[in-house]
Amino acid sequence: MTPWFLYLIRTADNKLYTGITTDVERRYQQHQSGKGAKALRGKGELTLVFSAPVGDRSLALRAEYRVKQLTKRQKERLVAEGAGFAELLSSLQTPEIKSD
C-alpha cells in the first residue's frame, strides 16, 4: 500500500494551503509550476513548510479535512512544532461507533 502524506504550503502572502498526496516532492513541483491546485496559481513564491505521513487515503482525507478546520494560529503551531499532529491522527484512527 502506498503511504499518503499531509502537507502545508505557505504562499507569498503568508496563507497556508493544506493538501494530501502520495508523493510530496512531485506534488510540490506541480504547485510550483502552476499545474497543481487552482487555489495556489498566481500566489507568488510557494514554500513547503510541513509534511507528514498519515497512512492510507481515507485517513489522509480525514486529516486534511480536520487540519483545514484549524485556525491560522493552530496551523502555525503545527508548522512550527508539529503541535497536536500525533493526537489528531490518533483521534482519526479511533473507530467510530455507529448506532442504529
Curated annotation (Swiss-Prot):
Q: Which InterPro entries does this chain map to?
A: GIY-YIG_endonuc (IPR000305), GIY-YIG_endonuc_sf (IPR035901), UPF0213_domain (IPR050190), UPF0213_GIY-YIG_endonuc (IPR022992)
Task: State one Pfam family annotation.
Answer: GIY-YIG
Recorded GO molecular functions are: 3'-5'-DNA exonuclease activity; DNA endonuclease activity
Gene3D superfamilies annotated for this entry? GIY-YIG endonuclease
PROSITE patterns documented for this protein = GIY_YIG
Q: Which GO terms describe its biological process?
A: DNA damage response
* Residue intervals of the GIY-YIG domain: 2-77
SUPFAM superfamilies the UniProt entry points to = GIY-YIG endonuclease
What HAMAP family does this protein's entry cite? Answer: UPF0213
Family, according to the entry, reads as follows: Belongs to the UPF0213 family.
Protein's recorded name? UPF0213 protein YhbQ
Query: Organism source for this protein?
Result: Escherichia coli (strain K12)
Show the taxonomic lineage. Answer: Bacteria, Pseudomonadati, Pseudomonadota, Gammaproteobacteria, Enterobacterales
